[in-house]
A protein has these predicted regions:
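Alpha-helical protein-protein interaction scaffolds
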Residues: 174, 179-183
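A general alpha-helix detector
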Residues: 150, 165, 181-182
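Sec-dependent bacterial lipoprotein signal peptides
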Residues: 1-7
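Amphipathic alpha-helical coiled-coil segments
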Residues: 156-174
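A non-transmembrane, solvent-exposed segment enriched in polar/low-complexity residues
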Residues: 7-153
């Protein structure tokens, strides 16, 4: 007789291991989501009850943008959905409940590093555009059409520079899967 026995092993399934901590979160539900046919679909659900750390193992066919949605039970606003670029390996997400998006530190993904670099530079274009909008609004309020027209032209130029930067950044990082998300 041949006797086969199986051991109880804690094997992790999948090629992506996600760990994290949301400081200050005592109770809530996290959903790891992906876009399927223009809709966010949950691929894992994590219940938080007393301990703010979490862990998930997923199987990715290729690197892609995923979203960590925090259901606080009170609101369903945009500041509850944290995007991150996932790729096989280990990714760590550290943030806080009070400043869920702005405190987020995501490590373990080269594509995420490139995406963060792009977002940092892109923020400068957005900030410049907001300043120009404010100046243009004041010029219109003061009935200074010449200044308003000049500021409108500067806004157009800033928008073109923003698009050119995004295209150039994507081309310079074309070997990474994040490039199409930028361009």
């Amino acid at each position: 007789l041949l006797l086969l026995s199986a051991c109880n092993q804690n094997e992790t399934k999948g090629n992506l291991h996600i760990t994290g901590n949301i400081k200050g979160l005592k109770k809530g539900t996290l959903y790891i989501q992906r876009v399927v046919d223009t809709t966010l679909v949950a691929i894992d659900t994590i219940h938080i009850d007393g301990i703010s750390t979490f862990e998930s193992n997923l199987d990715l066919k290729s690197p892609e943008m995923l979203y960590l949605f925090l259901d606080r039970g009170v609101s369903n606003s945009l500041d509850n959905n944290l995007s991150f670029f996932a790729e096989p390996g280990t990714i760590t997400i550290e943030t806080s409940l009070d400043r869920y998006l702005s405190d987020a530190k995501i490590t373990g993904s080269k594509n995420q590093e490139i995406f963060e670099e792009y977002k940092k530079i892109n923020t400068r274009f957005t900030d410049e555009n907001l300043t120009l909008i404010e100046k243009r609004f004041n010029a219109i309020k003061n009935k200074d059409t010449k200044a308003a027209d000049s500021l409108s032209a500067k806004q157009d130029s800033n928008t073109k520079r923003k698009y050119l930067f995004a295209t150039n950044f994507a081309l310079n990082n074309r070997d990474f899967e994040v490039a199409p998300y930028i361009a």
